[in-house]
């Protein structure tokens, strides 16, 4: 009799243990489901960074600070990729002057880095930067924008940065109307443009080209250094916001504004 009672007690304990284990398992499963990140947050997005730097004669004397600023910008993109690995960062970097480049098909545009993943992008060097001649900005923009458009898909993010210390004065193929039409068309596709200018009314020059974001800087060593510093902080904020912003037009405006509020 005692043996039967002990057996029943043991079976009861085992049954309770199994039941308790099932409940714990269900709770753990529930917790895992709740904590699991939504699959869409892990989606990889391509970010195309097009950086266009003036290499005309008026940039002479600012070679070191300009090259340093470009490299700091490239490092910002590297840092962004480390922080946001779901953003695949691609870089095209080019300069321009009125002296045709034999290496670039006698074009005014000098492509230094072309559609490279950021971890493959080598730093810019002073030997690659020799300011001379005039400012064919529109032809350079037209060439680079049309070429980049061939690679961009509807889900990609595009950030175009133009840095110049003077106004357009040499282009032959593109005029202001053609450039404005091109920029407006790409703007409608969600591309973000920024125009950084010295020795001019940068806001007016940007507006004439259909560019929403502009920043004015002083074309001396300190002004150039401060300009690159501001651009880098604005760029990092852009990458951060692009991860969560669903309305692309909100990314396209106010690129520099938040810096002013800090």
State where each predicted segment sits.
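Positively charged n-region of N-terminal signal peptides that target proteins for export
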Residues: 1-4
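Acidic, low-complexity intrinsically disordered regions
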Residues: 7, 11-262
């Amino acid at each position: 009799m005692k043996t039967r009672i002990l057996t029943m007690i043991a079976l009861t304990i085992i049954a309770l243990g199994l039941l308790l284990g099932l409940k714990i398992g269900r709770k753990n499963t529930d917790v895992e489901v709740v904590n699991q990140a939504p699959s869409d947050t892990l989606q990889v997005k391509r970010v195309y960074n097009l950086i266009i730097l003036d290499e005309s004669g008026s940039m002479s004397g600012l070679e070191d600070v300009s090259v340093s600023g470009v490299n700091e910008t490239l490092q910002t993109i590297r840092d962004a990729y480390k922080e946001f690995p779901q953003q695949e960062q691609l870089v095209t970097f080019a300069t321009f002057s009125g002296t045709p480049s034999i290496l670039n098909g006698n074009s005014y545009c000098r492509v230094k880095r072309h559609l490279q993943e950021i971890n493959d992008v080598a730093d810019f060097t002073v030997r690659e930067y020799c300011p001379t001649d005039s400012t064919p900005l529109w032809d350079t923009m037209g060439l680079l924008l049309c070429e980049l458009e061939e690679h961009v898909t509807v889900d990609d993010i595009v950030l175009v940065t133009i840095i110049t210390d003077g106004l357009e004065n040499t282009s032959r193929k593109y005029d202001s109307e053609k450039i404005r039409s091109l920029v407006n068309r790409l703007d409608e596709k969600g591309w973000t443009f920024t125009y950084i200018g010295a020795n001019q009314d940068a806001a007016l020059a940007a507006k004439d080209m259909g560019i929403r974001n502009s920043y004015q800087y002083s074309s001396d060593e300190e002004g150039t250094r401060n300009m690159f510093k501001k651009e880098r902080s604005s760029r990092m904020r852009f990458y951060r916001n692009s991860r969560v912003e669903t309305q692309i037009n909100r990314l396209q405006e106010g690129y520099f504004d938040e810096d002013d509020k800090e």
